[in-house]
Amino acid sequence: MPVVLGQSSPTEFIELQKDGYIVIDIRREEEWIETGIIEGAETITAFTESGQLHKDFQEKFFSLAKGPETPILLYCRTGNRTEMLGNALINQVGLKNVYHLTDGIDEWKKSGNVTSNYTPTN
């Protein structure tokens, strides 16, 4: 049976996070500042504003995703970027345990979940 990208609602996302999945917010820094981030999330920008893969993404991502079985939870604003990235991580890289927040942080907040303020590191 082929591996597919897991879909998760905010409620399912919380359960997967409790189960030890690594949570990665793949948005850009200005988005983290605007909406905040999900508590416990790693912040690793995946795409530039023009849609290119960010030059630092692979190094930062694979420092967390040590092997194909690493449980990963991705989220972005609406789920579009994470769907594209998650499918690539499964189909091209060979990861086997990747989920994404299907409708992104927009749905997370609409569902009444809170975010933590993001503080730039530099």
Segments the model singles out, each with a brief description of its role:
Residues M1-Y21, E29-P71, N80-N122:
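Rhodanese-like catalytic fold shared by cysteine-dependent sulfurtransferases
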